[in-house]
Amino acid sequence: MARPSLSPSNPLGFTPWPVTVITAVVYLALVVPLLVVHHVVPSAPSSSPKGLNLTEAWADLQELTHGFHPYNSHRNDEVHEWLLKRILELIDSAPPASEYGSVGEEKPDIVVFDDTQSNLTFSGRGSGLGVYFESTNIMVYIRGWEEDRERWWEDPHGRPAGKGGVLVNAHYDSVSTGYGATDDGVGVVSCLQLIKYFTTPGHVPRRGLVLLFNNGEEDFLNGARVYSQHPISQLPHTFLNLEGAGAGGRATLFRSSDAEVTKPYMRAPHPFGSVLSANGFEAGLISSQTDYVVFEGDLGLRGLDVAFMEPRARYHTDEDDARHTSLASVWHMLSAAVATTEGLVSDASSRFEGLPREDGRIASGSGPKGVWFDLFGSAFVVFELHTLFALSVTLLVVAPLVLLVTSIALARADKMYLFRSSASPEDSDGSEVVPLHGVRGFFRFPFLLVIPTAVTVGLAYLVTKFNPYIIHSSEYAVWSMMISAWVFLAWFVSRVADFARPSAFHRVYTLTWLFLVEWVFLVISTVYENQYGLAGGYFVLFVFAGTFLATWISYLELFALPRKSDYATQLALPSRRTSSHGSRLGTASGEDVEDGEDEDDDGTTAEATETTSLLRGQRTTFANYVRVTGDYLRDDDEEPRQPNLYGHEQAWSIHLPKWVWVLQFLLTAPLVLIFVGPLALLLTSALRQTGQDGSPSLFIYIAVAALTTLLFIPLLPFIHRYTHHIPLFLLCVFAGTLIYNLVAFPFSPANRLKLFFIQEVDLDTGVNHASLSGAYPFVHDVARRLPSTAGQNITCDLAMLRPKCSWHGIPPQVVQPAAASKMEDWLSYNITKSDSEPKAQLSISGRNTRACKVVFDRPVLDFQVADSAYDPRFPHVSPDGTKEIRLWSREWGHTWTVDVEWAADAEETDEKGPGLSGRVVCLWSDGNSAGVIPALDEVRRYAPVWAGVSKLSDGLVEGSRRFEV
């Protein structure tokens, strides 16, 4: 029998072709712009805006990235001197005072601080690590026109008056294996341009502005911590930190302190970011930190963290250079920095002022936690977390009540077909009923949701087992596999269900299920908002709001149906006539009809015999419907159909509007794509290459599977109307991408595997071991390719969550033979032990280095570094003692004097010997000259094109000598 359908001439009808085309077009119309926004950086303007010079900025970036410039390198000193020169050039190039007068301003006072005096000893919280660091920071202070003219910082007891200023920070050191273009060269040149901008007439700041070029960020955020010891650090109450956790692309707002300090970022021409990234940082999904934690956590400032985030494969490698970034990326960070800083320095309120604090931190006040996100990289939304909480609670209460009231109204109007299997004619005593089949479709949703989602989760485990790093280079192959599998299975399951039990209520029941599921998620999100201050679930509110409206429309749609009693009466009329003519309004096809015995003319029933049908009481009328027990009316699937009825759905569905589904789809799918789509892309970019850092690979695949469900779950109410074309195409896509994801090599020249290098030398014996850490077995394969490993036994052990493969390396030449003929002369130390107390004094120096450390076999109780400053905001000893003391100096060949104290009973409990024991280690990090670290040169030369090299620790070469007292 032919399967009738609604008129194909209606372009908005709920029929296969309109549903397929409209849903596909809407998804493409939103997904494509999201991808473009995520991957394409807005072009820099053809001419520089007033107060900026992009040509200068690009030239500065090229000069800055001329070589590796970690703190412990001679190139770092060159960068320091170059920065001072450039800063003075920019200040000298400021217009004369007369030009400021023409716009009603005064030329601002500018003070440059070259801090070569500050130092600090501090500890890593709970890590058993102590650090002594000497500053080479550069600070530029542009006095605000609202500030007084006193030079308060020259008074040892001086304090800034008036409202707090603004700090903009970038670090000018790089890692020893990266040129530092985006980490943090773009931030540095942005700060240079801010000097130019805020010394231009018309841009003089209201509040004081401090531009900090800090040195030593890469080695435990040392530069930001020692900045706290300079008097100018008392001025700023707010800050903007410019960073790079990737290598190019867009600069994203990673995190911020509160809603008030975030609002100036709304001025950015191309805002980018989501509060969910801040929650991800707090959860430790990204295994790195920025100076933000020092300024906010240790100093008490309120501010923002803007950073590049991808690709992490280039982060801290030689591909973090000017060639792999662009002027567009420079402009994206610079424009955001200008807009945000201008908003902060022009603020006339007292919102960033607070009561004095007893802990010594800045009295910057406190603001409400914020919720923030961008919309297509063009607009930025900021509101307070308690607003989100209030909206969430309101919607949690109002939405169910609205549906409940609507359901009651439907019931009173006798139009509540949902959950109704039958209805009685109006004048019936209840013994005669007409089938409605209103329950059909209610139990489909769990299968529609669980089966596709379970398969995608299974795919996540499958890929993790056989090719866990494929997402490193082929993230969209993984996405394509997940999406194609999910959509095809959802379509297949829905088509099977629709074929077996067709229902006009598939849409309303699926939306009702979605409403219930999302209501539960909104409850969870609201609890986390209230209890833990987590705002990352903001998207649930908007998605739930759209689903609620779509569900409500489905309920309102039922008012278009006839009253159930009228409908049943109209169907029952033929059974009460002797005529063979009858109504077919109630015929619902797809039901099998069993013939029963005819009634006698007087309505009596023939006496039952052994030949009587077992279905006695079920009677076929002249109208071809059937009475079951109690005159239950049924239909015959051979009956002629209503012309506007779709398929074998219930006959009463012809009264339902045919276009409403479009409105429902537009209320659900676009909201999901707009709010969840950017989060999916952000999470993929931020985490897809973290497996090489030791993070669990399974997490990102599970996240992709879960996000696939979130992104495509709006299709479930409509997908049973899909034609077979797109699902079958997706089945082919799934087959191809599954094979590719299981067998393809996971790395490429554009997405290299990052390996971590270190060479450790025993200066007493001359024995050295070069090591590479990284993903196994690839790290072993790379080590085996090196000429120096031929014939050697490469040993691989687990270290710092990563396999570490070591071999006897080519001896380093970090100290020239003319300076020291023997390796043991590279490092000198002297230890003097107290005769009466468990104390000792160590004097340590290294040749051609300004970084050493002392590693103890057992934690010491206390230590003091000669001439060091101490600050109660930065405890210098961990609660469980100190096992390692890192020593940094601004001078080459410096001698550190360290006094240590250990437990009084240590001599009695030490099985290794009396007193104190451990290693003195010096670090060499300058890899700019070939032949200085030949083992590293060999790795760079012979490693495959799909592998890159980064540093494992602060030093590329670590030379050690043992001590015992």
UniProtKB/Swiss-Prot annotation:
Biased composition (Acidic residues): 591-604
UniProt-annotated glycosylation sites, renumbered to this chain: 53, 119, 793, 830
Any one GO molecular function term: metal ion binding
Alphabetical keyword list: Glycoprotein, Hydrolase, Membrane, Metal-binding, Metalloprotease, Protease, Transmembrane, Transmembrane helix, Vacuole, Zinc
EC number assigned by the record: 3.4.-.-
Site feature location: Transition state stabilizer: 315
UniProt similarity note: Belongs to the peptidase M28 family.
UniProt xrefs under SUPFAM superfamilies: Zn-dependent exopeptidases
Keyword Transmembrane set for record: yes
Record topological domains on the Vacuolar side: 38-387, 463-472, 529-532, 683-698, 747-965
Textual note on the cofactor: Binds 2 Zn(2+) ions per subunit.
Organism: Aspergillus fumigatus (strain ATCC MYA-4609 / CBS 101355 / FGSC A1100 / Af293)
Domain of life of the source: Eukaryota
Bilayer topology annotation: Multi-pass membrane protein
Transmembrane regions: 17-37, 388-408, 442-462, 473-493, 508-528, 533-553, 662-682, 699-719, 726-746
Chain sites annotated for binding Zn(2+) 2: 183, 218, 316
Name of the featured protein: Vacuolar membrane protease
Active-site annotation: 217 (proton acceptor)
Entry binding sites for Zn(2+) 1: 171, 183, 243
